[in-house]
UniProtKB/Swiss-Prot annotation:
Keywords: Isopeptide bond, Ubl conjugation pathway
Family: Belongs to the ubiquitin-like protein UBact family.
Function: May function as a protein modifier covalently attached to lysine residues of substrate proteins. This may serve to target the modified proteins for degradation by proteasomes.
Cross-link (Isoglutamyl lysine isopeptide (Glu-Lys) (interchain with K-? in acceptor proteins)): 63
Gene for this chain: ubact
Residue numbers spanned by region Disordered: 1-63
Sequence ranges of Basic and acidic residues compositional bias: 17-50
Protein name: Prokaryotic ubiquitin-like protein UBact
GO molecular function: protein tag activity
């Protein structure tokens, strides 16, 4: 034997590859907590830029 461990240079695998924070019950990426834009405000801004585009958007989304 060459004196190396069976795990190589990385060491033994840990049971959990990351540290859990207290209160972190769910795994995976989190969705940022931001408020949704007001659709009326969005349509007003679209109307200023291109009136036809705001009309098409309203038809497509059912507004």
């Amino acid at each position: 034997m060459s004196g190396r461990s069976t795990f190589g240079r990385f060491g033994p695998p840990s049971s959990e590859p990351w540290e859990r924070k207290p209160g972190d019950d769910e795994g995976g990426p989190k969705r940022p907590k931001v408020e949704r834009p007001d659709t009326n405000d969005l349509l007003k801004r679209m109307r200023r830029v291109d009136p036809n585009q705001s009309r098409r958007y309203r038809q497509r989304t059912g507004e």
